[in-house]
Regions:
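Pentatricopeptide repeat
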Residues: 4-9, 13, 24, 39-44, ...
Length: 234
């Protein structure tokens, strides 16, 4: 029995998650020979795979191939490309593609908004990041843990500790399940502001919430002590 497109998509997705790129490409190239024509989902998985590898040239080549085959990219496709551009520091291209997506009548998802907000913060464009966050809410999207983490990180890196803590408290009030990244991000902000004691208070709170510190947690605290010149405590 021949494998159908759905089966191939599942296989490609599984291989991609394991980082087996050569096998992903081999399966993709085999599909037409086996009578399984790649679908929009197939192309989106492939594009996402290449973007995560930093191979934007191949990702956009597949995007163009899709269009030539009259397969219309969907929100998942755009999300992969925008995230890929953002991760590779190509924020202007990411914003242009976002605008192109809107002009074509596609509605962005929360992943796209969060990715762009993260990119804007990393550019140092805090005002634009908050403006996009407001737009996200107006479009009916609720901030999830990932979005909050991005804002806390962006504010913390800009020295806006009080604002970052306010968002942290807001997450508590909304009953969101804070994760290790949430705590690590705020700890990093406190350590950067030379407030290691506050970072350790967060460590205690983190463990009371049933979250175990990870390598990133300890690296953050050690770096905090080193920055203070307290090498003996580190």
């Amino acid at each position: 029995m021949k494998a159908n497109v759905v089966t191939y998509n599942a296989l490609i997705n599984g291989l991609s998650k394991k980082g087996q790129i050569d096998e992903v490409v081999e399966v993709f190239n085999t599909m037409p020979k086996m009578g399984a024509i790649p679908s929009i989902v197939t192309y989106s998985i492939m594009i996402d795979t290449y973007c995560k590898q930093g191979n934007l040239q191949q990702a956009f080549a597949l995007h163009n191939e899709m269009i030539q085959k009259q397969l219309i990219p969907n929100v998942v496709t755009f999300s992969a490309l925008i995230n890929g551009l953002r991760k590779n520091g190509k924020m202007q291209e990411a914003k242009d593609l976002f605008q192109n997506m809107l002009e074509k009548g596609f509605f962005p998802n929360s992943i796209i908004y969060t990715s762009l907000i993260d990119g804007l913060f990393k550019q140092g464009n805090m005002i634009a990041a908050f403006k996009l966050g407001e737009e996200m809410i107006k479009k009916g999207f609720m901030f999830d843990v990932v979005t909050y983490n991005v804002f806390i990180n962006g504010l913390g890196n800009r020295g806006k500790i009080n604002e970052a803590k306010e968002l942290f408290s807001e997450m508590h009030q909304k009953g969101l399940a804070l994760d290790c990244i949430t705590f690590n991000t705020l700890m990093h902000a406190y350590c950067k502001a030379s407030n290691v004691n506050k970072a350790f208070e967060l460590l205690d709170e983190m463990m009371r919430n049933g979250l175990m510190p990870n390598v990133a947690t300890y690296n953050t605290l050690i770096a905090g002590y080193c920055n203070l010149g307290s090498m003996d405590k580190a």
